[in-house]
Amino acid sequence: MTLNQDIVNRYMDGFRKTDREQILSCLTDDVVWKIPNAFETKGKAAFATHIVDEGFTGRPDITVARLIEGDDVFVAEGTVRAERTDGTTMHLVFCDVFDMRDGKIAQLTSYLVQL
């Protein structure tokens, strides 16, 4: 397993466990997170305010169907299912593009489709 693959797996595992510290440990201090046409945040502190959302209950079910690595770019494709506190379920497919720097995630671009 490459260092980049290990970091991306730790990042995904942090979301599965709703472990904010584990997620943040995978990021550079100046990380950029983009969801095209919807959202962009810069910096680890800002990133932290958008993870482990209080509007959900329990742990999300995250399945990674495919991982692709090339140089310092890593792509993960999969699905997420999570229960909301209002009783509804969020179900989406994702494609996350990770730009890596010095063994950490420097930029994340997330493409999300609600099912």
Each PLM stretch: what is its role?
Residues 32-41:
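A short gly/proline-enriched turn/hairpin at secondary-structure junctions
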